[in-house]
Amino acid sequence: MPATPSLKVVHELPACTLCAGPLEDAVTVPCGHTFCRLCLPALSQMGAQSSGKILLCPLCQEEEQAETPMAPVPLGPLGETYCEEHGEKIYFFCENDAEFLCVFCREGPTHQAHTVGFLDEAIQPYRDRLRSRLEALSMERDEIEDVKCREDQKLQVLLTQIESKKHQVETAFERLQQELEQQRCLLLARLRELEQQIWKERDEYITKVSEEVTRLGAQVKELEEKCQQPASELLQDVRVNQSRCEMKTFVSPEAISPDLVKKIRDFHRKILTLPEMMRMFSENLAHHLEIDSGVITLDPQTASRSLVLSEDRKSVRYTRQKKNLPDSPLRFDGLPAVLGFPGFSSGRHRWQVDVQLGDGGGCTVGVAGEGVRRKGEMGLSAEDGVWAVIISHQQCWASTSPGTDLPLSEIPRGVRVALDYEAGQVTLHNAQTQEPIFTFTASFSGKVFPFFAVWKKGSYLTLKG
């Protein structure tokens, strides 16, 4: 927009063009000049000219029809805008040059062919546009506030969940500590019991041995005395003395009974397993916490035309009527299969799938390599880049080469898949019974993706979580 140098704002009282003093009870005549009311002659004093007109402005001698004289217009509040060139009040606005105009500017040659209107009229379209923009901004502000409110609610829900999980973790570890403390007390009590049994049997052993030592001491003393007797006395009871002197076999008692020794050995073996049990528990806990149970969804760009995905991309079902979908090098066209998203090139990950089979239907659940064949006939084996189990109503087998029949106690209605990329393992469990289904070992290169296939009407798979 061009600058408007003709505009100035007067902050002092404008002067009267007749008396040159400050305006008092100012009025503006139609030509635009401003005077004090007392300085402006009365209309009757100005008189009618021969032309039938009345002089309304003593300065410029502008005339108006006598029958339609214009009354003086009161001057607006002080400090209003005046033309810098003519010193007159601004009444008009030029749309072409975007300039403010006084009466003289309006009548000048520069703006004769331009669109000129009163300020109040000229400003209206701008006010309308501003109001429209204001409404749009207000709506945008309200929408942002609504979004902020919703996000704050989500945040509050998440914080509440975190607080709940913190409580669950604390409760779980408190219970674990209580259980460990209880087991510690039981083990120590058992050890004290064994210790008491040892001391008891030791006391019994010492008592028996002491009694035997005392008996033998008395016999030794008696025999020593016999040896000092004269021959006539010694021979009197020779047979009795001989029988008493015969060696009696002393059965030495065992300090610890074999039964107690067995109990101690058995308990010792249990104690030896404690460090290993603790190590395994610690490793399993760490392994469980390291596993990424992130959200898995189905990738529509890879889905066969025979599959229908749910709006949330968590469920897939088979349809006999192939869908009209754009062709893509990523899309399966030989097998009713679909990949999950995202793919993985490191770490531990797991996901769970609910299985529902229609009459004669089946499904495949596992992982597939990034380069798995997607066009034409494809194989389902580890050699083809697929590590999965194939499930039907009657049987379940692993995609090894050749396939491995899996004699399970029941056909899984849910499968939990655990991927350990660095270890090169894909482990599948029955999600309901926790029964192991199969474990693949492989050397992965590149990304691997969750892999699903389903066939026959009425068959579908649903990702959990």
From Swiss-Prot:
Compartments where found:
Cytoplasm; Nucleus; Cell junction, Focal adhesion
* Domain B30.2/SPRY, chain residue ranges per copy: 276-465
Q: Which terms in the GO cellular component ontology are assigned? A: cytoplasm; focal adhesion; nucleus
Identify the keywords attached in UniProt to this record, alphabetized: Cell junction, Coiled coil, Cytoplasm, Metal-binding, Nucleus, Transferase, Ubl conjugation pathway, Zinc, Zinc-finger
Name the CDD domains on file. Bbox2_TRIM10-like (cd19765), RING-HC_SHPRH-like (cd16569), SPRY_PRY_TRIM15 (cd15826)
Its recorded reaction(s) are: S-ubiquitinyl-[E2 ubiquitin-conjugating enzyme]-L-cysteine + [acceptor protein]-L-lysine = [E2 ubiquitin-conjugating enzyme]-L-cysteine + N(6)-ubiquitinyl-[acceptor protein]-L-lysine
Q: What is any one GO biological process for this UniProt entry? A: negative regulation of non-canonical NF-kappaB signal transduction
- List the InterPro entries hit by this protein, alphabetically: B30.2/SPRY (IPR001870), B30.2/SPRY_sf (IPR043136), Butyrophylin_SPRY (IPR003879), ConA-like_dom_sf (IPR013320), PRY (IPR006574), SPRY_dom (IPR003877), TRIM/RBCC (IPR050143), Znf_B-box (IPR000315)
Which PROSITE patterns does UniProt cross-reference here? B302_SPRY (PS50188), ZF_BBOX (PS50119), ZF_RING_1 (PS00518), ZF_RING_2 (PS50089)
Disulphide linkage map: none
Which spans of this chain does the record mark as coiled coil? 126-229
Stored Pfam families:
PRY, SPRY, zf-B_box, zf-C3HC4
PANTHER family for this protein: E3 UBIQUITIN-PROTEIN LIGASE TRIM (PTHR24103)
Can you name this protein? Answer: E3 ubiquitin-protein ligase TRIM15
